[in-house]
Amino acid sequence: TVELYFRACDNGKLGITQSIGPGYRIMSKVKWLLGKIAIIKSQNYKHAKASGIEDSISRKLAFAPHINIGVFSLEKDSECWRVWQKNLKKTLAKGKVFGSEGLAINIAVYHDNVDVEFLPLKCNWITSHLLPKYDSKENTFVEPYLPNEKIGIIHLAAGLWKDKKDMRLNKDVKIELDTLE
């Protein structure tokens, strides 16, 4: 997995994973008003509006697959750093600190069109979207669908919740995982 990140950022590209893939059931939350008007609640849109990002960019981000910035790669002289910093200044000016760096990179990719190499989910597996399976023969976590690729990085973004307790904060929280067997 780490090797893929090194390869992905060749020639100034951003190496990163989108939060979309097989088995993901929801792309975005939507609240329906009077049964006909959709109030978009996607992470990108919500953060963009709170940060004062103009409507045209906010709307473009609304249904773009969210890019989680928890794991990424960039060469030190990549142009993407400058674009990201420009966007980060905008998002921090009016928005909250939490989520600003992610919003800035989503704007860089979907609005500024920086060069990007999208990596597979196994490079940044977000458990709150979909739990992995466990391969007890290989003693490793794998994607829950065929061909059950080995997961390289597991990310507890948004936590794992059970009985209103977050596994990141409460080590007594236990979850059940399906196995390959």
Each language-model region and where it sits:
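Glycosyltransferase catalytic domains, chiefly GT-A lineage
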Residues: T1-E181
